[in-house]
Design a protein with these regions (language model features):
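N-terminal export signals
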Residues: 2, 9-32
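Secondary-structure end/capping motifs
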Residues: 235-321
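Solvent-exposed, acidic/flexible segments
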Residues: 52, 73, 77, 148-152, ...
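Conserved C-terminal helix/tail region of periplasmic/extracytoplasmic solute-binding proteins
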Residues: 309-346
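Pocket-lining segment of extracytoplasmic ligand-binding domains
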Residues: 97, 178-270
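Short, surface-exposed acidic
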Residues: 68-69, 166-169, 271-282, 326-333
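Short, glycine-/small- and polar/acidic-enriched structural segments
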Residues: 34-173, 189-195, 346
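Sec/Tat-exported extracytoplasmic proteins
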Residues: 63, 88, 93, 103, ...
């Protein structure tokens, strides 16, 4: 399958961890389920729940003795899609926009869980010196952001809500790690980006004028990152997928509710300061299994009129309009599989 998704060079770093623990796996799943299994888990390497799982090595218990876990570090949703297309990545959290791009290009993968609700972890920041106060005042201005990402979609949606289209502004495709320096050089009037870049821009003469969470009130869109799983892996290893999601559900609550433990773990694991960890904690909003299967989010298996399905369809339309995909999938909501969430919610 050919995917024209690259907005940055594909770079994956794999750290193999051979798991060895006796007895049964976490949540009482027999360790025999996981023996001789190989699982490639993606992580963006930042201060998030997925990397907290890696730091705690909780998968050693979840997958049991004999299981081999490879942690694959990715830098963007496009890398997740490319790695899954090549079979080198089985499960990873990903923004909903690149998820749609992958599905539209024939990637055989499913969203099995909403990783988090996006409220204030993504935002549109403007230079104070620009005098811009509203989204509608961005006409003709330079906006830096990484293309084929959730912030790309959010930016287009915010502009549309203000009566502007992509042609009314200068959208500049940039890696997240280059935006802060361009901002300092005043080469940008605005940027739509995520934490931890947001506070750096604010500290360097910026003001937030729009948050991705605002799309829920202005356009009725539930914004989220999701867990994507290769369909072949899901079919062959449903018990491992369920075990992983059970562990994530527990870790996500701990990540949010036990800041002292998270700070102690992540500052050591990533060599970052406490303030950086707290910024991520304060912008992370997990969704419980029972919430996942409501119509606001994924809904129950077979349910069509859901918040996730609506958001994916709107995103697909935006991606087609902006030339990021050639056709809109007939049923983009078909990529959602809430059967695992149903089992967790029972």
């Amino acid at each position: 399958m050919k995917l024209s998704l690259s907005r940055r060079d594909f770079g994956l770093m794999a750290a193999q961890i051979t798991v060895g623990a006796a007895g049964t796996t976490l949540f009482g799943l027999p360790s025999a389920l996981a023996q001789q299994k190989s699982v490639n888990l993606g992580t963006f390497g930042g201060i998030d729940a997925q990397n907290y799982i890696r730091a705690k090595n909780s998968m050693a218990q979840t997958f049991g003795p004999g299981a081999k876990v490879d942690y694959v570090t990715v830098r963007a949703g496009s890398e997740v899609i490319s790695a899954m297309a090549g079979g080198s990545l089985d499960m990873c959290n990903i923004g909903s926009s690149p998820m749609v791009v992958g599905y539209a290009n024939g990637l055989a993968a499913s969203m099995v869980y909403a990783y988090k609700s996006i409220i204030d972890s993504e935002a549109l920041v403007v230079q104070n010196s620009s005098g811009i106060k509203t989204v509608g005042e961005l006409k003709g201005k330079r906006i830096g952001l990484p293309f084929n990402t959730s912030v790309h979609f959010a930016a287009l949606a915010a502009l549309k809500g203000a009566g502007l289209g992509p042609g009314d502004v200068q959208l500049i495709n940039m890696r997240a790690d280059t935006i802060a320096s361009a901002w300092t050089r005043r080469e940008l009037d605005a940027s739509y980006i995520w934490v931890p870049v947001i506070p750096r821009l604010v500290e360097d003469g910026g003001t937030i004028i729009f948050k991705t969470g605002d799309l829920a009130t202005t356009q009725g869109l539930a914004m989220f990152d999701g867990f994507l799983v290769r369909d072949e892996f899901k079919k062959q290893n449903p018990d491992l997928v369920l075990a992983f999601l059970k562990d994530f559900d527990t870790i996500a609550r701990e990540f949010k509710q036990n800041p002292k433990e998270v700070v102690a773990t992540m500052t050591k694991f990533l060599s970052v300061d406490e303030a950086a960890v707290m910024r991520s904690l304060n912008t992370f909003y997990p969704i419980s299994a029972k919430e996942q299967i409501t119509s606001k989010w994924m809904g129950k298996p077979g349910e069509k009129d859901t918040g996730v399905a609506k958001t994916l369809k709107v995103q697909a339309d935006f991606l087609k309009e902006s030339g990021q995909i050639s056709t809109v999938p007939k049923d983009v909501g078909a990529m959602v599989d809430s059967s695992f969430a149903m089992k967790l919610a029972a």
